[in-house]
Amino acid sequence: MVVVSPPSPDAVAPTGSDARWIPDLLGPSYRRLELPLGTDPDGEGPISATLVRHEDSPDQPVAALLVVHGLSDYFFHTHLAEFLADRGIATYGVDLRKCGRSRRDGLTPHFITDLERYDEELDQALDVITADHPGLPVLVAAHSTGGLVVPLWLARRRDRGALDPVVGLVLNSPWFQLDLPDRARRLVDPVIRALGSARPYYRLPLKTSDRYVVSTHIDHDGDFHFDTELKPPGGVGVRAGWLAAVRRAQKRLQAGVDLPLPVLLLRSTASSVGTHRGDGVLDVDTDLILDVRSMERFADRVSHQVTDIPVDGARHDVFLSRADVLEVVFRHLGDWLDQTLAPHTKES
């Protein structure tokens, strides 16, 4: 069984290390760096993002990978970092503004009215990674809402001739569509736009369930340790201004971004969004959050080099699946990494 253990006590900073990197909640193998972002354009005061670095990465890595989370989430995937380290890859994770480690008193968790603003911390994170590893190829792995944010960010970098050193993208159950029937979506979109403009902080009265988070946490039905203050079982709520921003971004992505990059799409074979088995129990070994059919439908709008891997038994965050399923996920990820990095690996 794969288990992500509770964090160990903080380590002492290595001799000669950059003092800006401080001990992280994940323990001595991880350190974090604050990425200052100035004053919040949405009017909530000073904001920052947080970059986390795996300190046990190889001395001479072949690549670096940046992990970007989704809504009501943060970076805690130590098992992924260890898998990547074994393959010679240095891992970083970013907690975006108002998310995870970047939450502060007086800030509305995960709230933003334009997803393009995340470009600032993503650009900063990439600058830090390239300074740590000059000339090294970089990959990005993005989950759920992060899987919507990142392709659009990379498209804007491409448009200004700054896509390098990014050489590949992993999409982990990306959120490409508002999963409603077409007619309902057409009716709801004007309401979302109006509310997002008039009352951006309005918390929509949407039904939520804690089943997905409970199914993954080690104290309940899962194998993974994470902070339920930073990843709350019931979520952080959906604000009108945030959802309006998501819908604008989804429509831009659906129009096509056509990244000149290989893309790996990891997702479940099935969803149980709003559905139950006959005994009234949710099938937790499916995607409980999003409809995987939307991921399949819009993947080719991201790139024409998409490897779509539906994994039986995978959960919404495929890296939080059962141990036997995770083994399959890692096998596919490893194969894709080998293929993607081969043209960029220097001969010894």
Could you say what each language-model-derived stretch is?
Residues 132-144:
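Alpha/beta-hydrolase fold nucleophile elbow
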Residues 111-132:
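Alpha/beta-hydrolase active-site loop
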Residues 305-348:
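Catalytic active-site module of serine/aspartate enzymes centered on a nucleophile-bearing elbow/loop
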Residues 145, 150-240:
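Alpha/beta-hydrolase-fold enzymes
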Residues 52-99, 103-105:
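Short, surface-exposed "cap/lid" segments of acyl-processing enzymes
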Residues 203-310:
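Serine-hydrolase catalytic core
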